[in-house]
Amino acid sequence: MNISDPIADMLTRVRNASRARHTEVIVPASRTKREIARILVTEGFIAGVTEERQGPTQILRLTLKYVDGKAPVVSGLKRISKPGLRVYARKTDIPRVLGGLGIVIVSTSQGIMTGAQARKAQLGGEVLAYVW
């Protein structure tokens, strides 16, 4: 099956799995998804990520995180820049999510990073997603 927006597919899988209280979710691997997963682990939204081979394809196994084993830590994920409508932000225009309670994932010339890291490095780029 051909997926037109693999990043949106990954975010939707994580959102659906966390709402269904699953302990882990499997997504097809790519370099971009690996970087997004790394950011989610670093920022404390998911517990861990492992890369595995499943037949001929690489997969990422994301271990989800819950508050007191009940409420998911990830309360929301939103894809911003889409294949049909790309959204870019200058270094001064990178948005803040929920007044700083969430994160922005930005694709810059130096790689994929959070909005705070992009502001600190004075880099703009494509706004991939909001996570809160």
Predicted regions and their residues:
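Core subunits and conserved enzymes of cellular information-processing
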Residues: M1-W132
